A protein has these predicted regions:
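N-terminal export leaders
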Residues: 1-3
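Structural signature of multi-pass, alpha-helical inner-membrane proteins
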Residues: 15-153
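Short glycine/proline-centered loop/turn elements that form peptide/ligand docking sites
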Residues: 7-8
């Protein structure tokens, strides 16, 4: 009986969707292929997750000198696009563009088959700027997905 009395509350809470707040969408990441038409090969609607991390800076002998990178994970369809474009364009670079500015670069060394694309941020980007970029992107992507889902119906 207790379970039956809770069913209406459970069904209402599971139907509630996260609402998009357009004011929280401050960044729309777009990915362009170097030297190609100025049309993004992937955009903010393709991204499922972004993560922040560090990588070794190969330009210095100092082992503690790290550079920040963003790892983008894509949905299945977009991962297939990413694989196709990276297989075709070995030796070129992908640019992460936000607000008209290139903020990250990925040199294409081979096909990316796992749907995860890392972008190295500028070597002189301070930690607080990298964290700010990550936080704004994360928040924006949550609201972009909610916006997309609400328009999809």
């Amino acid at each position: 009986n207790l379970l039956l009395s809770l069913l209406p509350a459970l069904s209402l809470s599971s139907c509630r969707k996260f609402r998009s707040d357009p004011e929280k969408i401050t960044m729309r990441p777009r990915i362009f292929l170097e030297g190609a038409a100025p049309i993004p090969i992937l955009d903010e609607y393709d991204v499922r997750l972004v993560q922040l991390g560090t990588i070794a800076n190969i330009m210095t002998e100092e082992p503690n000198d790290r550079m920040f990178a963003l790892w983008f994970s894509f949905d299945r369809r977009s991962a297939m696009t990413l694989q196709k474009e990276t297989v075709r364009n070995v030796g070129k670079r992908l640019h992460l563009v936000i607000g008209g500015e290139i903020v990250g670069v990925h040199p294409i060394e081979g096909g990316i088959t796992d749907g995860v694309l890392p972008f190295v941020l500028s070597a002189n980007m301070p930690e607080e700027n990298a964290v700010y970029l990550y936080n704004e992107l994360s928040t924006s992507l949550v609201h972009i997905r909610a916006e997309f889902e609400s328009k999809k119906g």
